[in-house]
Amino acid sequence: MKNFIKSFRLTLVFCVFFSVCYILVLWIFAQFAGPNSGNAEVVELNGKVVGAANVGQSFTEDIYFWGRPSCAGDGYDATSSAGSNKGPTNAEYLAEVEARIDTFLKHHPYLSRKEVPAEMVTASGSGLDPDITPDCAYVQVQRVAKARGMSEETVKAIVDKAVEKPFMGIFGTEKVNVLKLNAALEKAK
């Protein structure tokens, strides 16, 4: 019985430590160490909040850059964030990807099938990726410039400014946040 009480006490101590203290220490660290103090980075346009930079949104109009397709619920439903778990041999998945390629080519007639970035037709693991690679952004420059009546050089310059370098220069890859890029386009009107 003596061993049981010691074990029970130790279990309670570890439960409190790992469910409260550990999380509190991580939260305090995030408040000082990370960008945005561990909180969401809110994107504003003309004084109105248009979204959070760390959660992907659906953009389907030609005047906007598009992010990766989402498999999170119906569109970009953050409450249903998850991958589809469909593999490359799944007929339903292949049909979805083919349909996405056809849609992408319809809006980008200047590209061949081989030039369509895989990232733009396959959903991410979370289904809510806020970023695309610079190459995916540059592929869309011609469409966005034409739809907005802007020069390709102007739109490309906006993309160039939106490219974020890897963290500390070595962790990760270059990326473009789609929401921030589209907000920058709106400001450039």
UniProtKB/Swiss-Prot annotation:
GO terms for cellular component: plasma membrane. It is found in: Cell inner membrane. The keyword Protease does not apply. GO terms for molecular function: ATP binding; P-type potassium transmembrane transporter activity. It holds the Pfam family KdpC. Keywords: ATP-binding, Cell inner membrane, Cell membrane, Ion transport, Membrane, Nucleotide-binding, Potassium, Potassium transport, Transmembrane, Transmembrane helix, Transport. The keyword tRNA-binding does not apply. It is a single-pass membrane protein. The chain crosses the membrane at residues 10-30. It comes from the Bacteria. The system is composed of three essential subunits: KdpA, KdpB and KdpC. HAMAP family: KdpC (MF_00276). NCBIfam families: kdpC, PRK00315.1, PRK14002.1. Belongs to the KdpC family. Part of the high-affinity ATP-driven potassium transport (or Kdp) system, which catalyzes the hydrolysis of ATP coupled with the electrogenic transport of potassium into the cytoplasm. This subunit acts as a catalytic chaperone that increases the ATP-binding affinity of the ATP-hydrolyzing subunit KdpB by the formation of a transient KdpB/KdpC/ATP ternary complex. This is Potassium-transporting ATPase KdpC subunit. It comes from Phocaeicola vulgatus (strain ATCC 8482 / DSM 1447 / JCM 5826 / CCUG 4940 / NBRC 14291 / NCTC 11154). The gene is kdpC.
